[in-house]
Amino acid sequence: MQQALFGGGCFWCVEAVFLQIRGVEKVTSGYAGGHTTHPTYEQVCQGDTQHAEVVLIDFDEQQVTYSQLLDVFFATHDPTTLNRQGNDIGTQYRSVIYYFNEEQKQAAEHTIQTLKDDDLDIVTELSPAPTFYPAEDYHQNYYEKNPSQGYCNFAIPPKLLKLYSKFQHLMKDQ
């Protein structure tokens, strides 16, 4: 089993996307990249911890590759806006890839360069994986548990539509 660690705005949205991908065994919402140990959601939202909202993805590389996960990541959030995803503004919503090994770093660098070659101004941070802190239990599988919640209804369906239209070949059998 391999792991990927991505931040692309609100972790509820990113989690909802990656739970649809074949070979993804588990997605854990959490925090990484800051200076506070065991931060709370409230602390991260205040912006003082410097943590990003991230998802830790456990995946089977025999079913989905890290590069394919990168493609999904970049297609389902805005990697060109610094510290912002839609109406969510703050460093906790930054676009970030934390890599666990040199192969992941190189794959991410290649994907970012390909997007830049297409004239996209990518602001995604690329850094070694720091300590990951799981978010509080009520954040886990949030969209699955709260599909009619207002924010979720606004932010997540457009991401899922993009996912379904561009990555049908990577979707879990329903």
UniProtKB/Swiss-Prot annotation:
EC supergroup of this enzyme: oxidoreductase
Membrane-crossing residue ranges in chain numbering: none
Entry annotation: catalytic residues: 10
HAMAP family in the cross-refs: MsrA
UniProt protein name: Peptide methionine sulfoxide reductase MsrA
Gene3D superfamilies (alphabetical): Peptide methionine sulphoxide reductase MsrA (3.30.1060.10)
GO biological-process terms attached to the record: protein modification process
Naturally occurring in which organism (per UniProt): Acinetobacter baumannii (strain SDF)
Family annotation (Pfam families): PMSR
Summary of the function given for this chain in its UniProt record: Has an important function as a repair enzyme for proteins that have been inactivated by oxidation. Catalyzes the reversible oxidation-reduction of methionine sulfoxide in proteins to methionine.
E.C. numbers: 1.8.4.11
Keywords assigned: Oxidoreductase
Gene Ontology MF terms in the entry: L-methionine:thioredoxin-disulfide S-oxidoreductase activity; peptide-methionine (S)-S-oxide reductase activity
Catalytic activity: L-methionyl-[protein] + [thioredoxin]-disulfide + H2O = L-methionyl-(S)-S-oxide-[protein] + [thioredoxin]-dithiol; [thioredoxin]-disulfide + L-methionine + H2O = L-methionine (S)-S-oxide + [thioredoxin]-dithiol
Matching InterPro entries: Met_Sox_Rdtase_MsrA_dom, Met_Sox_Rdtase_MsrA_sf
Family recorded in the similarity comment: Belongs to the MsrA Met sulfoxide reductase family.
